[in-house]
Structures are given as structure tokens and as C-alpha cells.
Amino acid sequence: MERTFLMIKPDAVQRNLIGEVISRIERKGLKLVGGKLMQVPMELAETHYGEHQGKPFYNDLISFITSAPVFAMVVEGEDAVNVSRHIIGSTNPSEASPGSIRGDLGLTVGRNIIHGSDSLESAEREINLWFNENEITSYASPRDAWLYE
């Protein structure tokens, strides 16, 4: 089963949308196997967004992601990266499909509710960056028989 990293950003946490976002993810058949509400340390933010260092928006991005708690999570399911990317929607909420998390709940590119890994490689890197092994669990769910052939 594939795993991916998702992070509900400070704007969604402050708007009390954690439950709404998780519910949408679970309704699509993905299973939450790790999660934590946390204040992001500066060093973690800089490492996570290191690829954007030197870009004009980098400092604002780091300030935003460390400004309030986030809900970091690991979800599991068949084709989890692609399924979660589809549920999340386009980076720019005004271009995101209705029914997607960003299309329905996002306000601007900078306040777009959620981060999701964009590849299996990114998912593995981000999961290892944000979680220790003992913070992720595996479990069987009766619904699995109804979700997967």
C-alpha cells in the first residue's frame, strides 16, 4: 500500500477546517496512519521548503508555515500520491476544480489549505522528515475489503 505526506496548513487550522479536510481524504478511501498537530520549528520549515530558497516568496512562505500550528499526517491507500493530489486540487484555488479541497476551501495561492507530496520520492522524503517510525502505524480496517479488489 502506498503512503504519502499531507500537511494541513496554518490557514486551515485557524479556520477550524482540520476535520473537514481529513473527512474528505478518508471519504476518498485513504487511511490516516499518522498525524500530529504541531508548531513547525524554523529548521524543519527551512528543510522542508529548501527547494524554494532564494525565490521571492521563500521568506513569506517560511513565516507563514511557522506562524501557527499545522496538522501533519501520513495517509495510506492505493495510488495514495495521485489520489491525494486529485482531492487537493490545483495550487491556485481559483484554478482548482470545484469539489477539491482547494477549490472549495482555499482563498489564495499563499493560503491554499493543504500541502501534499507530489511524487513517491517526495512522499518518502517528507514522511521521513516529519515523522519518526514509531509515529506511524499500520492497521487493517474492515472497509479495506470494500475499497480494494
From Swiss-Prot:
InterPro entries: NDK-like_dom, NDK-like_dom_sf, Nucleoside_diP_kinase, Nucleoside_diP_kinase_AS. It comes from the Bacteria. Its main location: cytoplasm. It is an enzyme of class 2 (transferase). It holds the Pfam family NDK. Disulfide bonds: none annotated. The active site is at H115. It catalyses: a 2'-deoxyribonucleoside 5'-diphosphate + ATP = a 2'-deoxyribonucleoside 5'-triphosphate + ADP; a ribonucleoside 5'-diphosphate + ATP = a ribonucleoside 5'-triphosphate + ADP. GO terms for biological process: CTP biosynthetic process; GTP biosynthetic process; UTP biosynthetic process. The keyword Ribosomal protein does not apply. It is found in: Cytoplasm. ATP binds at K9, F57, R85, T91, R102, N112. Major role in the synthesis of nucleoside triphosphates other than ATP. The ATP gamma phosphate is transferred to the NDP beta phosphate via a ping-pong mechanism, using a phosphorylated active-site intermediate. Belongs to the NDK family. Homotetramer. This is Nucleoside diphosphate kinase.
